Amino acid sequence: MCWNYQVSLIFSVIYVVTNSYYVVKRPLYWKQYLLFGSFYLTMEVFQTLQWLFGNVYSDSMYGQSVCNSINVNYTIVAFILIWLQPILFSVIGYQTTTTNKWFFRVLTVLNCFVFFYGLKLLYGGFEKPDYYTISDSMFGSSTCTNEGETGHLVWRFKPKTLDVFPNHLTYIILCIISFVMYENNATRVIGLGWLLSLIVTKLLLAPTLVEIASSWCLLSIIANLLIVAYVHISTGIYLTGQ
């Protein structure tokens, strides 16, 4: 999910390697680690395909006023992948909790509502005439993808209304709510890796705000290798104690 299809493809390979490690090693919660890794592998492969076949436009402050259908369809898939992530994390929480089943059940329902409501608003935007746009934001003149200032993909959306359309802050809050409610270190390492990836990506790669949603290439290194390191260390401690 970085600068070009070659980079996205390389990070896809890293996901394949780490996912294979989870399957072979089978630590506690290996299915959740595999679910996490497989989802972001899907995102990396998707962005590889988008760079290759998605007809991505060049940099634009307000996005494209007219967007070809192939680009539009790729951008809709990007929206779906973005908003499946909070659902992913609440489902992982539900699968691994022993005391907060009710909480994660409610949170999953909330995340599903945000997902489907946002999708409804997105499709409603195709029938709405042009309205005001915000420069360098996720809201564009059309639902379309272009290359950003620092070379990352920029996914812009034209919803039916801007006022209640889920945004970056909504996304981060919903993800973090799941992380803070995880019950043990074996699952908290997923949230820690995700948060560290976000921080390091912003500091090291310095994507603009509008590019941040697609700038998750370091997640394959930071989050997955953090999980692998945790599994390796915790397994070693367990064996030592036998």
Curated annotation (Swiss-Prot):
Membrane topology: Multi-pass membrane protein
Bilayer-crossing regions: 4-24, 34-54, 74-94, 106-126, 162-182, 189-209, 217-237
GO cellular component: membrane
The entry's keywords: Glycoprotein, Membrane, Transmembrane, Transmembrane helix
UniProt subcellular location: Membrane
Residues bearing carbohydrate: 73, 185
Signal sequence bounds: none
Name used for this protein in its record: Uncharacterized protein R287
Organism (species): Acanthamoeba polyphaga mimivirus
